[in-house]
């Protein structure tokens, strides 16, 4: 009998160890991991530089509270602000917490209370971030959501313009809706959102929780578009598996988050900061990010060449190493078959297979994954 709440639909796999792009279960099976803890282990499992950094901090101190000056927090904040164009950082423990902080900051800084998000978005499972999320399925049974959130269709600028008003504090935007189906933002829509924010004095919050920290081949995905955010949220890949999140903001917002206005007991924990510093030092190297771009191109071109002619495949889309394969039917049976063959992938909605390999994946491993996907989906097309 399990003593855990059954909040997760668990796979029938028990992982015992991991190294690089590989995971191993209690039956001795090896898996090529194209889930990465859901875009978390960007440097793969047990990356030696992250292990060494956390191990060193373990022998120093683990926690002293944010009443003290903690130099490693400043180091990580400097790395984040330098790469993002932001000016200040609030550390927390997860993406939902980062988005909660962003929502609070937007309301306090502007004195307004309405926030616009998009259908099929995902921003977290706290009451505030659940209200922000544009997917009804995660809200079932939890009663009324906060009424100050408005959801409009993604990539629909006319719908957005109809909703914004004098009480709109912020627009929250994902450049790629990872959980919602790997839906890519239209470049013209991105530029139009930016213009609407500037024209009406609305804060632009970009949720980079799944796309940030190099996943798309740039430090942050928004940097590939005409977007000038006031706030950015990150988590997932920031600690490579160590729980850490962050909200980044511009200079004009700093005074709104004065002492006592927000906080987190464990936010900026020294162990988490050690992991994050090691991750950012590695990922934010130009050669590393360039390699991610090249791997992303290889993955997309390989998938298009191998799968585009299959009847079951509706569309292949992605950016960098965040890729979705939309099918004509539900993806769950194929995800299970791939897992049984040693390739771990996951869904993004019912009909999309999502690929999130570690950013350190090799060219050979990308080819291996494409081959496995072709075998499974080709068989399905033959039987259709």
Swiss-Prot record:
Family as reported in the entry's similarity comment: Belongs to the class-III pyridoxal-phosphate-dependent aminotransferase family. ArgD subfamily.
Keywords noted in UniProt: Amino-acid biosynthesis, Aminotransferase, Arginine biosynthesis, Cytoplasm, Pyridoxal phosphate, Transferase
GO terms under cellular component: cytoplasm
Molecular function per GO: identical protein binding; N2-acetyl-L-ornithine:2-oxoglutarate 5-aminotransferase activity; pyridoxal phosphate binding
Assembly notes: Homodimer.
Other facts: May also have succinyldiaminopimelate aminotransferase activity, thus carrying out the corresponding step in lysine biosynthesis.
Modified residues (N6-(pyridoxal phosphate)lysine): 236
Binding site for N(2)-acetyl-L-ornithine: 125, 264
Protein name, per record: Acetylornithine aminotransferase
SUPFAM superfamilies noted in UniProt: PLP-dependent transferases
Gene Ontology biological process terms from the UniProt entry: L-arginine biosynthetic process
Residues that, per the record, bind pyridoxal 5'-phosphate: 95-96, 122, 207-210, 265
Species, as recorded: Halalkalibacterium halodurans (strain ATCC BAA-125 / DSM 18197 / FERM 7344 / JCM 9153 / C-125) (Bacillus halodurans)
Keyword Transferase: yes
Compartments where found: Cytoplasm
Requisite cofactors: pyridoxal 5'-phosphate
Main location: cytoplasm
Comment on bound cofactor: Binds 1 pyridoxal phosphate per subunit.
E.C. no: 2.6.1.11
EC category: transferase
Catalytic activity: N(2)-acetyl-L-ornithine + 2-oxoglutarate = N-acetyl-L-glutamate 5-semialdehyde + L-glutamate
Annotated InterPro entries: AcOrn/SuccOrn_fam, Aminotrans_3, Aminotrans_3_PPA_site, Class-III_PLP-dep_AT, PyrdxlP-dep_Trfase, PyrdxlP-dep_Trfase_major, PyrdxlP-dep_Trfase_small
Pathway: Amino-acid biosynthesis; L-arginine biosynthesis; N(2)-acetyl-L-ornithine from L-glutamate: step 4/4
Record Pfam families: Aminotran_3 (PF00202)
């Amino acid at each position: 009998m399990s003593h855990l709440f059954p909040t997760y639909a668990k796979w029938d796999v028990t992982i015992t160890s991991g190294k690089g792009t590989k995971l191993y279960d209690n039956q001795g099976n090896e898996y090529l991991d194209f889930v990465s803890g859901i875009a978390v282990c960007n440097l793969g499992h047990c990356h030696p530089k992250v292990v060494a950094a956390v191990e060193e901090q373990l022998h120093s101190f683990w926690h002293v509270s944010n009443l003290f000056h903690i130099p490693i927090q400043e180091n990580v904040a400097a790395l984040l602000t330098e790469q993002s164009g932001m000016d200040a950082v609030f550390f927390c423990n997860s993406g939902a917490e980062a988005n909660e902080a962003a929502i609070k900051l937007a309301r306090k800084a502007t004195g307004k209370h309405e926030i616009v998000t998009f259908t099929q978005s995902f921003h977290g499972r706290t009451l505030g971030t659940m209200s922000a999320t544009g997917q009804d399925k995660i809200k079932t049974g939890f009663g009324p959501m906060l009424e100050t959130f408005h959801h409009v269709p993604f990539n629909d600028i006319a719908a957005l313009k109809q909703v914004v008003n004098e009480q709109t504090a912020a627009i929250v935007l994902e450049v790629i809706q990872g959980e919602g189906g790997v839906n890519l933002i239209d470049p013209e829509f991105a530029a139009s959102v930016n213009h609407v924010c500037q024209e009406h004095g609305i804060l632009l919050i970009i949720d980079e929780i799944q796309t940030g920290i190099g996943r798309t081949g740039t430090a942050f995905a928004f940097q590939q578009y005409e977007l000038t955010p006031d706030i950015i949220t990150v988590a997932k890949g920031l600690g490579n598996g160590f729980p850490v999140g962050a909200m980044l903001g511009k200079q004009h917002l700093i005074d709104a988050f004065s002492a006592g206005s927000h906080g987190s007991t464990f936010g900026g924990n020294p162990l988490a900061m050690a992991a994050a510093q090691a991750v950012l030092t590695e990922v934010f190297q130009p050669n590393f990010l360039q390699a991610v771009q090249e791997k992303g191109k290889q993955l997309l071109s390989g998938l298009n060449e191998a799968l585009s002619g299959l009847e079951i495949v509706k569309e292949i889309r992605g950016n960098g190493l965040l890729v979705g394969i939309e099918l004509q039917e539900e993806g769950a049976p194929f995800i299970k078959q791939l897992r049984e063959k040693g390739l771990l992938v996951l869904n993004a909605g019912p009909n999309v297979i999502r690929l999130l390999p570690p950013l350190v994946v090799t060219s050979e491993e990308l080819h291996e994954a494409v081959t496995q996907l072709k075998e499974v989906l080709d068989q399905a097309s033959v039987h259709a």
